[in-house]
Amino acid sequence: MAKRLDLTDVNIYYGSFHAVADVSLAILPRSVTAFIGPSGCGKTTVLRTLNRMHEVIPGARVEGAVLLDDQDIYAPGIDPVGVRRAIGMVFQRPNPFPAMSIRNNVVAGLKLQGVRNRKVLDDTAESSLRGANLWDEVKDRLDKPGGGLSGGQQQRLCIARAIAVQPDVLLMDEPCSSLDPISTMAIEDLISELKQQYTIVIVTHNMQQAARVSDQTAFFNLEAVGKPGRLVEIASTEKIFSNPNQKATEDYISGRFG
């Protein structure tokens, strides 16, 4: 668990459109890395390349290297499904299977892998729900539909589903954007706990959230409309928010643009 990610000279294209240019960065194990920047700067595009989710879009391609420890996830013969198992994703809006029970939501990935042993499934459901700080709230209604939970509970259910398959990395695409402040606090507390076991990358538009939950922060920006997004700088979150190297970073953090 908790592997390192390294990007070297990564360029991302959709057909002939150059979406992101020349990204090189290291994402350390058992830490939280935040991607920040204005809309359209490429931060979510980069996030999705980390587990090849962008490939669902026709014409998408990546140049450069993305290494999970020492394994290039884009090397010939690498199965994208295996990549997504090792590098899980939590999306912007909670997306549990609404008619499926809470228990079956959590173990859906294991069942897709062919696991049928009831004890293994039940034990995994409990451990994953505990890991997502949801067990005490749902342990007496595991057979009720996941769609009946509150928004914040649904997002934690999605996190439980992601960790049930024992990934090395968790990607989170604005996981609190549709949640109320109390639910957001619960997710942020959970992120701080999960980083003890997982490598976490989070995209957020909330500067305060990035400052609260992350160990390092990467700032992305656009040179101009129609130009590719670029990584401006990456450093410890303390440095990015107190003394960044680039004026563009300071301007964005201070709210002068974006």
UniProtKB/Swiss-Prot annotation:
This is Phosphate import ATP-binding protein PstB 1. Its main location: membrane. One of its GO terms (cellular component) is plasma membrane. The keyword Cell membrane applies. Keywords: ATP-binding, Cell membrane, Membrane, Nucleotide-binding, Phosphate transport, Translocase, Transport. The gene is pstB1. It is a peripheral membrane protein. It is an enzyme of class 7 (translocase). It holds the Pfam family ABC_tran. Its EC number is 7.3.2.1. PANTHER family: ABC TRANSPORTER I FAMILY MEMBER 17 (PTHR43423:SF1). It is found in: Cell membrane. It comes from Mycobacterium tuberculosis (strain ATCC 25618 / H37Rv). Signal peptide: none annotated. Belongs to the ABC transporter superfamily. Phosphate importer (TC 3.A.1.7) family. It catalyses: phosphate(out) + ATP + H2O = ADP + 2 phosphate(in) + H(+). SUPFAM superfamilies: P-loop containing nucleoside triphosphate hydrolases (SSF52540). The complex is composed of two ATP-binding proteins (PstB), two transmembrane proteins (PstC and PstA) and a solute-binding protein (PstS). GO terms for biological process: biological process involved in interaction with host; phosphate ion transmembrane transport.
